[in-house]
């Protein structure tokens, strides 16, 4: 068996090796049941135990109060861009929602919501600007909260708190009351930094995350919603996507992605065993500081994001000489550094350094960056 490479994929991303080993060991026989998790009925006692334990562990990791429902759904973050408005826009007589647009994913959220109601932009980073005397191109900065314009009668205010492609991150979420909209719940797409640092879930009405970045394999989406927001689905909302139904049946209203939920539950236990969300935050801060520190000190590479809003999870960077891009990627793969190519919409490179990426992987990347610069700089 070949050595495992360092996987910098933005998602689906690397899983903790200990989780993969446990899943492999239990593949044919889960806890003496004689069955693989993939063969279990989603309503049978074994899977009910797996699902309920995963929810309990997640609640413990996040300190969730009882008035928040936890749902394990399907469709990914992109699916939630439709499921959220179908569930929440019915809270108002005229379906409407506001959006803080800061990159690719919040742009798609805004566009999708427009199919179900009046989706307006409350703030945007779509234009170039200047911050502290530094020119910033579009999607590399975040609009100051005091510039947001939120309607008091909106069904919700949406933001993406970590833009996977652009590499910008909200470290704090505003209280809608401070924006003059106390009755407008905050909806946050936390997909690419879920469980990477403490998040003030209680400040939001609803958060969602595709698991395939920090929480597990592709196929399951975590939705956490304040219970008073359930039960307002638009008539066009499919029953399987109605949060009230999913919450009432403990994520088993229809057949859920059983194996993905099982592996996600193993990831929750791995996080608990490694210091919980605080432990993840400490490790992620160290990795990000190491990588950004090297990039900032190099004249060969450049990170385009405003320093104060850089993501700890997704680090885009460009080579000053873009004609070397192909050689860079080929050399990286030869060195066991995989999935470093940037998203097609922005080009360049991107290193996603999620929870499962150890400090040693980031150091291996930096060693390669140094060597490539030495040979081509």
From Swiss-Prot:
HAMAP family: SerC_aminotrans_5 (MF_00160)
Gene behind this protein: serC
Known pathway: Amino-acid biosynthesis; L-serine biosynthesis; L-serine from 3-phospho-D-glycerate: step 2/3; Cofactor biosynthesis; pyridoxine 5'-phosphate biosynthesis; pyridoxine 5'-phosphate from D-erythrose 4-phosphate: step 3/5
Alphabetical UniProt keywords: Amino-acid biosynthesis, Aminotransferase, Cytoplasm, Pyridoxal phosphate, Pyridoxine biosynthesis, Serine biosynthesis, Transferase
A single MF term (Gene Ontology): O-phospho-L-serine:2-oxoglutarate aminotransferase activity
Cofactor: pyridoxal 5'-phosphate
Catalytic reaction annotation: O-phospho-L-serine + 2-oxoglutarate = 3-phosphooxypyruvate + L-glutamate; 4-(phosphooxy)-L-threonine + 2-oxoglutarate = (R)-3-hydroxy-2-oxo-4-phosphooxybutanoate + L-glutamate
UniProt similarity note: Belongs to the class-V pyridoxal-phosphate-dependent aminotransferase family. SerC subfamily.
Any one of the GO BP annotations: pyridoxine biosynthetic process
EC number: 2.6.1.52
Residues that hold pyridoxal 5'-phosphate according to the record: 105, 164, 189, 212, 254-255
Job of this protein: Catalyzes the reversible conversion of 3-phosphohydroxypyruvate to phosphoserine and of 3-hydroxy-2-oxo-4-phosphonooxybutanoate to phosphohydroxythreonine.
InterPro entries, A to Z: Aminotrans_V_dom (IPR000192), Pser_aminoTfrase (IPR022278), PyrdxlP-dep_Trfase (IPR015424), PyrdxlP-dep_Trfase_major (IPR015421), PyrdxlP-dep_Trfase_small (IPR015422)
UniProt protein name: Phosphoserine aminotransferase
UniProt binding sites for L-glutamate: 43
Top EC class for this record: transferase
NCBIfam families: PRK05355.1 (NF003764), serC_1 (TIGR01364)
GO (cellular component) term, any one: cytoplasm
Subunit structure: Homodimer.
Cofactor note: Binds 1 pyridoxal phosphate per subunit.
Organism taxonomic ancestry: Bacteria, Pseudomonadati, Pseudomonadota, Betaproteobacteria, Burkholderiales
């Amino acid at each position: 068996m070949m050595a495992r490479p360092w996987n910098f994929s933005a998602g689906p991303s690397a899983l903790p090796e200990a989780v993969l080993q446990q899943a492999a060991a239990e593949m044919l026989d889960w806890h003496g049941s004689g069955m693989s998790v993939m063969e279990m009925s989603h309503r049978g006692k074994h899977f009910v135990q797996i699902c309920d334990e995963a929810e309990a562990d997640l609640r413990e990791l996040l300190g969730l109060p009882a008035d928040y429902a936890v749902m394990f759904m399907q469709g990914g973050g992109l699916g939630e861009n439709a499921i959220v408005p179908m569930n929440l826009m019915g809270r108002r007589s005229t379906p409407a929602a506001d959006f803080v647009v800061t990159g690719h994913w919040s742009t798609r959220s805004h566009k999708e919501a427009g199919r179900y109601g009046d989706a307006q932009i409350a703030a945007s980073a779509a234009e170039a600007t200047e911050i502290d005397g530094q020119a910033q191109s579009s999607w590399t900065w975040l609009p100051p909260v005091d510039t947001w314009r939120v309607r008091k009668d909106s069904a919700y205010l949406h933001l993406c708190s970590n833009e996977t492609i652009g590499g910008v991150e909200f470290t704090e979420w505003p209280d809608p009351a401070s924006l003059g909209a106390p009755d407008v719940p905050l909806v946050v797409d936390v997909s690419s930094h879920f469980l990477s640092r403490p998040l003030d879930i209680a400040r939001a009405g609803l958060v969602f995350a595709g698991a395939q970045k920090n929480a597990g394999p592709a196929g399951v989406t975590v939705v956490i919603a304040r219970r008073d927001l359930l039960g307002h689905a638009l008539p066009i909302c499919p029953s399987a996507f109605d949060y009230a139904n999913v919450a009432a049946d403990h994520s088993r209203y229809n057949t859920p992605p059983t194996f993905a939920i099982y592996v996600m539950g193993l990831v929750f236990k791995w996080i608990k065993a490694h210091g919980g969300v605080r432990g993840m935050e400490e490790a992620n801060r160290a990795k990000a500081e190491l990588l950004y520190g090297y990039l900032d000190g190099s004249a060969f590479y450049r990170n385009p994001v405003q320093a104060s809003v850089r993501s700890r999870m997704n680090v885009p960077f460009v080579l000053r000489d873009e004609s070397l891009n192909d050689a860079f990627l080929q050399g990286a793969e030869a060195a066991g550094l995989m999935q470093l190519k940037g998203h097609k919409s922005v080009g360049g490179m991107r290193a996603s350094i999620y929870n499962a990426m150890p400090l040693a992987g980031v150091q291996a990347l930096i060693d390669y960056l140094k060597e490539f610069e030495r040979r081509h700089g």
